Amino acid sequence: MSGKDGTETPVIAETSRTLEDGNCESDKNSESVDHSAMPESESELAASTGRRPEVKPSSDLETSKVQETVSKEETQTGWGYWGSWGKSLLSSASATVATVGQGISSVIEKAESSLGIPSPSEISSEVKVAAAETNTRENEDSSLGAGPFGVFSTISTAVQSTGKSVIAGGLDALEFIGKKTMDVIAEGDPGFKRTKGLMNRNATLSQVLREAKEKEELWTSNEVTMETDKNTHYGLLFDEFQGLSHLEALEMLSQESEIKVRSVLNSLSGDELETLKLELEQLKEAFSLAEFCDEEEEEKKGDEDFTKEVTELFSQLHVSTKPEKLTRARNTAYEWIKAVPAKTLAENKEEEKQLEGGNTEEVSKNSIEDIHAFAIRSLAELTACSIELFHKTAALVLHGQRQNVTAIERSQTLSQVTVVLCKELSFLSREFTTSLTTVGVKEKTDSLNPLITAVFLEASNSASYIQDAFQLLLPVLELSLIENRTESPTHELQVQKPLAQQ
Amino acid sequence: MEAIWLYQFRLIVIGDSTVGKSCLIRRFTEGRFAQVSDPTVGVDFFSRLVEIEPGKRIKLQIWDTAGQERFRSITRAYYRNSVGGLLLFDITNRRSFQNVHEWLEETKVHVQPYQIVFVLVGHKCDLDTQRQVTRHEAEKLAAAYGMKYIETSARDAINVEKAFTDLTRDIYELVKRGEITIQEGWEGVKSGFVPNVVHSSEEVVKSERRCLC
């Protein structure tokens, strides 16, 4: 596995990391995953990489230029902007195919063919089907905890069964996601399909998301829907918080940087080129997000800690932008959740006294829908804020004042930021689902579980958007590394000046 | 329903740094005036719906660019995908008025092959006592470039609505007359979603009548 070179190396490395993650859970389990996964994932991967360069239906001059250079780059190093997209996508794709098999892919297929984002009930019913299809396999594996499959099977069990004890299973799954955000990219059904579609259609992430949003718009305007209905459409909300625009702007910076980096590489030769390539290689390593298996850090942290952690990480980046908007949005979300159970419990009690049963369900039904709507809104807002931060960081890395921090240090910090953000999203989604469970205690599972599933799905989508946006920063930091190299003599002069004055 | 609009226009706001671009946009989109604001990094985004005729809404997507020179290479890239623009100068800062030529020259180079409908905005008109640019010379300059001229104040909320809605109306007219068309791969004008058929057929009837005249 390690002996491969060229295009496949990074991809396989990624796949193996996913599998190693499985190891953290239980040895017995990951073994079974290992055996079935390896051959399939490799063939899937080879097929995909082989297929990709053929798809060149570009009308735009610019894109075709990019594509040309991409295929060239692929044969050379297998990295670069598009290359790394391929890397993360392929690995997640192959992991899913290998471990999940037909069941889940049919879910994904159907979900995509219906709408940009399928309704929660739709997903849940599909998951039910998937669960039935993959039941045999699940029994063989006899596990809920390992690999991407584990998450889904847990959730499908939750959907299938009735009674409250099941929800605990669903929450376990969400807890599990915290450790496995990398794997989750694959299962975040609509998002995964969107990103997978990106590979086939040569579209950018923002284009894909824009299309999904437009589908939602079309749908909401055709259907005579209530205002509240619109409030649960992640895509529309993400755009409302300017997430799409920031993503588009980030993509522009990323593409420009990519072109510049390439032209620099083309202009170099011999030792100079080799040293630079080596440095760029180190930078890429910082972008590989390896630290999702931290058991210790998983424990719940105080409310203040996220704000503190993110603020500190941003000060390490030495860019003038501050994550206040993000931390504010996050804290608002937490305050809201905290206020929820108390309020509804009080309401319920009063209601019970006055009306004795009957209407109480009405009250709590509104409440779980409120929580669901707020959860989706918060996830969309936090994701948009995160992407805005990445966009601002890119602009400042390229055009800010020169700082005493290397591109590699910045990459490492940004990688940590990404991990923190994704963990926070999974934690937040767990808070929301806990809240849903508490408030919807009298609900039928049929109405409660789809909402829980939807929150979980959008949380994993959010995490994958953030990780994709993070990958867009790679060319930006590559360019910054190159510029720092060439400008270092003048930089030294500037440092010496004050000394001479003394 | 709120989410429904006929078109989406992308507008760009440009001009020297500290002329008040972000404050003007915030007043328009958020209805408040921010006393202190950090310089814009690269570009920021805002959006708002504008009702140009009863029941007819346009969604404005506003790109707030950084005025600082160091971000110029970023902001240049945004002209191409805008249908309209507000070119701001500060009436208390002569230099920012003199730079209007430069801004227009720059956009001309980078907007090809499309066009942007610009309005010239003399901002901070509440500070009339510190005025360094007369209304007359600003109007003359605007006319020379075929632009409208308007004076605004974000602090006192003077003409802020008018600046944006007049520009939106002008663009809407051009779109209706077919002088600006929706194009694949261009983000300047996008078609929105019309909720019922009656609405759009009414549209067709109107434009036919227009043709006969």
UniProtKB/Swiss-Prot annotation, chain B:
GO terms for biological process: autophagy; protein transport; Rab protein signal transduction; regulation of autophagy; synapse organization; vesicle-mediated transport. Changing residue 192 to R: In WSMN; impaired localization to cytoplasmic vesicles. It comes from the Eukaryota. The modification Phosphoserine is found at residue 201. It is a lipid-anchor. Highly expressed in the brain. InterPro entries: P-loop_NTPase, Rab39, Rab_GTPases_membrane_traffic, Small_GTP-bd, Small_GTPase. The keyword Magnesium applies. GO terms for molecular function: GTP binding; GTPase activity; myosin V binding. PROSITE patterns: RAB. Pfam families: Ras. Keywords: Autism spectrum disorder, Autophagy, Cell membrane, Cytoplasmic vesicle, Disease variant, Golgi apparatus, GTP-binding, Hydrolase, Intellectual disability, Lipoprotein, Lysosome, Magnesium, Membrane, Metal-binding, Methylation, Nucleotide-binding, Parkinson disease, Phosphoprotein, Prenylation, Protein transport, Transport. Changing residue 22 to N: Dominant negative mutant. Its main location: membrane. It is found in: Cell membrane; Cytoplasmic vesicle membrane; Golgi apparatus; Cytoplasmic vesicle, Autophagosome membrane. Belongs to the small GTPase superfamily. Rab family. It is linked to Intellectual developmental disorder, X-linked 72: A disorder characterized by significantly below average general intellectual functioning associated with impairments in adaptive behavior and manifested during the developmental period. Intellectual deficiency is the only primary symptom of non-syndromic X-linked forms, while syndromic forms present with associated physical, neurological and/or psychiatric manifestations. XLID72 patients can manifest autism spectrum disorder, seizures and macrocephaly as additional features. The small GTPases Rab are key regulators of intracellular membrane trafficking, from the formation of transport vesicles to their fusion with membranes. Rabs cycle between an inactive GDP-bound form and an active GTP-bound form that is able to recruit to membranes different sets of downstream effectors directly responsible for vesicle formation, movement, tethering and fusion. RAB39B is involved in autophagy and may function in autophagosome formation. Interacts (GDP-bound) with C9orf72; C9orf72 in complex with SMCR8 acts as a GEF for RAB39B. Interacts (in GTP-bound form) with PICK1 (via PDZ domain); a PICK1 homodimer may allow simultaneous association of RAB39B and GRIA2 to PICK1 which is involved in GRIA2 trafficking. Interacts with isoform c of RASSF1; the interaction is strong. Interacts with isoform a of RASSF1; the interaction is weak. Interacts with the DLG4/PSD-95. Interacts (GTP-bound) with HOPS complex components VPS39 and VPS41. This is Ras-related protein Rab-39B. It comes from Homo sapiens (Human). The lineage of its organism: Eukaryota, Metazoa, Chordata, Craniata, Vertebrata. The gene is RAB39B.
